[in-house]
A protein has these predicted regions:
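Conserved lysine of the Walker
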Residues: 52
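Pre-Walker A adenine-sensing motif
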Residues: 20, 24-35
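Short phosphate-coordinating micro-motif centered on Lys-Gly-acidic
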Residues: 2-15, 109-169
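Short hydrophobic/aromatic beta-strand immediately N-terminal to the Walker A/P-loop
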Residues: 41-43
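Conserved NTP-binding catalytic cores of kinases and kinase-like/nucleotidyltransferase enzymes
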Residues: 152-218
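P-loop (Walker A) phosphate-binding loop of NTP-binding proteins
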Residues: 45-47
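Conserved nucleotide-sensing/catalytic segment adjacent to the nucleotide-binding pocket
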Residues: 66, 71, 75, 79-123
Length: 218
């Protein structure tokens, strides 16, 4: 994992990593889900088959607390709405968008500012895309297994703190036995804290290993 913090008048933070499988993508999205707040925008970019829908599905299922939730691609409906415990999430696919006028008609960015927006093909949004956001760029990892992906996460504006915290969380988990554990989001309390149960399956007579992960932003 590589980090590249950027200092400017507008805060930004970026880091990159390689993921070896869909399960690894799901773990990354579960960790990101722990940090999201109302009003966040996540932009998923990459070519056809890069893994945008896989990321979106994993993130939504984690936020919903339902690992088998049906998450259809909004390629034709353009926007799919999910009323989640923490906020409403709008999952948009802008592949078929061809003009700024169509973006305006979607009302994707003009509705409740507390909504979280998860956007595939964000480059079709043009200048309508908010500056405060989390960009996730996916690409095939050259010369490796077909399921392997390179992922670059960049936070700009208010998104910079989320991405920097995610980078710190991954470094922390990589120092523990739970880096590859299954993440299960737990109901939070009235504070800004969020929680996940980490589970490593046991083998034979060895029971599962579990731990509680708490995100407590200052």
């Amino acid at each position: 994992m590589t980090n590249a913090a950027q200092s400017s008048e507008t805060p930004a933070f970026s880091f990159s990593l390689a993921v070896a499988s869909e399960e690894a993508i799901a773990r990354l999205m579960a960790d990101l889900a722990l940090l999201l707040m109302p009003g966040d925008t996540i932009a998923l970019s990459g070519g056809l088959g890069a893994g945008k829908t896989t990321c979106a599905r994993a993130l939504i299922r984690q936020l919903a607390g339902d690992p088998v939730l049906d998450v259809p691609s909004p390629t034709f409906t353009l926007i799919q709405s999910y009323d989640l415990p923490q906020f409403t999430l709008l999952h948009a696919d802008l592949y078929r968008i061809t003009s700024p006028r169509e973006i305006d008609e979607l009302d994707l960015f003009d509705n409740d500012p507390r909504n979280v927006r998860l956007i595939e093909w964000p480059e079709h949004a043009g200048n309508a895309l908010p500056h405060d956001r989390i960009d996730i760029a996916l690409s095939h990892h050259t010369g490796q297994a077909p399921s392997r992906r390179d992922v670059t996460l960049t936070g700009t504006g208010l998104g910079a703190a989320r991405v920097e915290r995610l980078s710190a969380l991954l470094r922390f988990l990589n120092q523990t036995e739970f880096a590859d554990a299954q993440r299960t989001r737990l109901a939070g309390d009235a504070s800004s804290r969020s929680y996940a149960r980490m589970t490593l399956p046991g083998t034979g007579i060895v029971p599962d290993s579990t731990a509680l992960l708490m995100n407590s932003p200052r």
